[in-house]
From Swiss-Prot:
It comes from Brucella suis (strain ATCC 23445 / NCTC 10510). PROSITE patterns: 4FE4S_FER_1, 4FE4S_FER_2. It is a peripheral membrane protein. It is found in: Cell inner membrane. This is NADH-quinone oxidoreductase subunit I. It is an enzyme of class 7 (translocase). Its EC number is 7.1.1.-.
Length: 163
């Protein structure tokens, strides 16, 4: 009986030591998490974040008021009013609103746009304190486009072979 007791004690001590060693290795190993506000992980070029309206390099807005994005939006979050036809036969929007509360970030609006006017940009930090701040009008969308244009253009160029 003494030999069984001795074997059990040595076995349990060995198991305890190996478990403790494993715990210490993990404790001193490099951390797998990021300290979020100060460190940010990589974002995919196909990430669908905050919406933006883009401009052409000459400063003119890209949206031609075709209303394809409004028609394809499953959440009916987009409202567009087209202005009168211009002398060259094109149209531009008078009103372009997105209700970000309704938006499900599916990306259909971006896929439907024939001129890459509406895009979902790389910004994922757009929390607000009130719901009213999540109703984006044309000016807010154009400001987002101006702010994120370099990253948006890079992401579209990276995704071009797959479109």
């Amino acid at each position: 009986m003494a030999s069984i007791t001795q074997a059990a004690k040595s076995l349990l001590l060995k198991e305890f030591a190996s478990a403790f060693a494993l715990s210490m290795r993990q404790f001193f190993a490099p951390k797998a998490t990021l300290n979020y506000p100060h460190e940010k992980g990589p974002v995919s070029p196909r990430f669908r974040g905050e919406h933006a309206l883009r401009r052409y390099p000459n400063g003119e807005e890209r949206c031609i008021a075709c209303k394809l994005c409004e028609a394809i939006c499953p959440a009916q979050a987009i409202t567009i009013e087209a202005g009168p036809r211009r002398n060259d036969g094109t149209r531009r929007t008078v009103r372009y609103d997105i209700d970000m509360v309704k938006c499900i970030y599916c990306g259909f609006c971006q896929e439907a746009c024939p001129v890459d006017a509406i895009v979902e940009g790389p910004n994922f930090e757009f929390a607000t304190e009130t719901r009213e701040e999540l109703y984006y009008d044309k000016d807010k969308l154009l400001a987002n486009g101006d702010r994120w244009e370099l990253e948006i253009a890079r992401n579209i160029a990276m995704d071009a072979p797959y479109r």
